[in-house]
Amino acid sequence: MATYEPVIGLEIHAELKTKTKMFCASKNDPDERHPNVNICPVCTGQPGTLPVINKEAVYHVIKVGLALESKIAEITKWDRKNYFYPDLPKGYQISQYDEPICLGGELVVPGFSKKIKIRRIHLEEDTGRLIHEDHIGHSMVDFNRAGVPLMELVTEPDLNSGEEASAFAQELRLILRYLGVSDADMEKGQMRVEANISLKPTDLKELGVKVEIKNLNSFKAVRDAIDYEIERQSKLLDGGKKVMQETRGWNEAKGRTIIQRSKEESHDYRYFPEPDLPPIHIIVDGRASPALAGGPPTVGIDLEKIESSIPELPSQKRARFKNNYGLRDNQTAILVSNEKLANYFENVVSEFMNWDKEGPDKDSLLAPELDANPHFIEKERQEIINLSANYLLSDFLGLLNETSAEVGDTKINAENFAEWACLIHRGVITSRAAKDVLKEMWATGKDPSQIIKEKNLVQVQDKSKLEETAQKVIDENETAVSDYKKGKEASLQFLIGQVIKETRGRANPETIAGILKKLLH
């Protein structure tokens, strides 16, 4: 059997967050549930109507291009892509063919340390949505989506597996969200992935026949469909058969791709320049090019203004969290994957950073024994930052998931969370009691110290009291004591649990373990 190298390129469409559609004033509302309400004569292709460019959508695509280090075209134009389909009311789609807004660029795929080159990013209008109702025997069309601004990003064929492709798509979605240009919610169809897959023998440079898989609407579907297609093509080639150039779809239920139609080429769409829209000129340094003097009318876009609005990107935030706060890769990955959670974490960290400026009362939370020693305080600060990250990614995220809440919905402000983490680190409360305090903070928004005082949750530090409680548990559990002395370590855990129960969760398990071992020997 021959050995093949998968060669994969992606085409990713993302609906852009704008108030209105791409070429008309109809509302762009992805959450609209009533069909055919956000429409007008322009987006439904009525005779005599003229399109007007949505500048906000152009800004968004340029912002994405700059974030991905693309070359921004000085002049870009519009083209008509001609084809017939029921969800395309005009009979053509306004898109960009030979002069896209962005050319080139790259994106590093997290976890693979691999740069994937971008071929182009362009802007077009979305189609309507077909709704198939089997029980009534026909399909219906909703044009609310028709004309919505749609960004299309095309990669070079630099990917080699379904896992890589899925990771690329996830990182792109995160960038789009950080930039604020798209929610890219795949469940709502706001981001759709198409994959072009071919196989080539590892000892040859010539690429194999390309197969396109359309409209993959989840990251799992991207991974599974590509991996299936690689296997399907491998079996064909190993059996002496040819791979046909075609478009296929992904059947999630059956776990396989299915043929839809033969693959179209660009000439099948009969592209020609859009006669009703002027080209766009990208202005650099606020100055228009002299070459445009006396030329056709243009729409000017200020590149510097857009560039200045680009925030810190996910890859930059991961690196900063790792370098500045000493977080592990898995911690930074989860924190940065949710921008609101990352911002909340930063607010918690800023509390620790500011405490040394707020007087001894705050510093004593970090280092009560040596609150005058700045080096000791800094060491404690770093430990608590790491502790805070751990609790955010476990207990705090758990509460978010349990209540189906967003980070912005929490009643726990950053200052209270920071104080809570410090109290755990100092041993004022046990980890078990800390969970109860956090739940109470979640429900009420109260200060953790207030909750600890009200519920009498301060950790028992009196060794004589702990020894007394431990002896009581030993006396009342002869069977467990006997089992432990026979070598059953699980019995010790049972006894520790009983002591913790007696102290209502206010005893440190490690301290109790030491006391029990001492008393039992």
Where are these regions (language model features)?
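Hydrophobic face of alpha-helices
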Residues: G9, V58, A169, R223, ...
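C-terminal non-catalytic interaction appendages of large macromolecular assemblies
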Residues: A2, F143-V148, M186-V193, T202-K205, ...
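Intrinsic, low-complexity polybasic segments
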Residues: G286-P290, G294
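Conserved structured core elements
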Residues: K55, N144-G147, G162, S166, ...
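Basic, nucleic-acid-interacting segments
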Residues: M1-D285, V299-E312, N323, D329, ...
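Long, charged, helix-rich clamp/arm modules that form nucleic acid-engaging surfaces
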Residues: K241-D285, T298-E489, I500
